[in-house]
A protein has these predicted regions:
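Extracytoplasmic beta-strand-rich oligomerization domains located immediately C-terminal to a leader/signal peptide
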Residues: 26-128
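N-terminal single-pass transmembrane signal-anchor helix
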Residues: 2-31
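Edge beta-strands of extracellular beta-sandwich domains
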Residues: 188-193
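Intrinsically disordered, low-complexity regions enriched in Pro/Ser/Thr/Gly and acidic residues
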Residues: 93-171
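Short, exposed beta-strand-loop hairpins at the edges of beta-sheets
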Residues: 176-183
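Conserved acidic
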Residues: 19, 50, 135
Length: 194
């Protein structure tokens, strides 16, 4: 009797290669799906972080309002808080001065919405000089609309501030901010003001 030769037949090799190819494809798809999911989570997390940072910055500015009127580049007296046509200009306190320099703790802050970007500019110089223009930095992207409503002393929500006939140091009682965010819908925040 002749002994059988040891080894695999061509058919057995093809079946083994096919099984290996199927397992490799499944493993690749699993890893690829996990990486795509991780990228999506990372993008969402970055957007949430940016949103929280923008809200915290805005909240810090708005909750430290100071009733100090300012002067524009022509020397005309302007209210401490001006909100019109999607733009906001305010004076806030609380600027740190750890070295105790002889300066105020007040800051002039401006916000605006331009091409889907919520922008902020801050300046320690409250009264503008001719040619001064604030330098804006983007704090949040993907904002299709920003609506600011101010609660006056009579309990009415107003789109513009200050109301007609109000003194320059007049401040509202509360603020309602609505952002329309691309892909997320409407976000609304309210603050009781000092």
């Amino acid at each position: 009797m002749k002994g059988r030769s040891a080894g695999f037949t061509l058919l057995e090799l093809l079946v083994a290669m096919m099984v290996f190819a199927v397992l490799a494809t499944l493993a690749y798809q699993g890893i690829s799906g996990a990486l795509r999911a991780q990228e999506g989570v990372t993008e969402t997390q970055a957007r949430w972080t940016a949103l929280q940072r923008a809200q915290a910055l805005f909240a810090r500015d708005i909750t430290q309002l100071a009733p100090r009127p300012v002067r524009d580049a022509r020397g005309d007296r302007q209210p401490a808080l001006v909100a019109r046509s999607g733009q906001l200009s305010l004076v806030r306190g609380g600027m740190p001065n750890p070295l105790d320099f002889p300066r105020s703790d007040l800051v002039r802050v401006n916000y605006r919405l331009v091409d889907g970007r919520w922008q902020r500019a801050a300046s320690p110089v409250l009264d503008a000089a001719p040619g001064d223009a604030p330098e804006f930095a983007t704090v949040l992207t993907g904002v299709s609309r920003a609506e600011l409503l101010w609660l006056d002393d009579e309990g009415r929500w107003r789109g513009d501030w200050p109301p007609p006939g109000a003194p320059p140091e007049a401040l509202p009682r509360a603020l309602r901010l609505r952002w329309e965010l691309a892909g997320w819908g409407t976000l609304e925040r309210r603050w009781v003001l000092p």
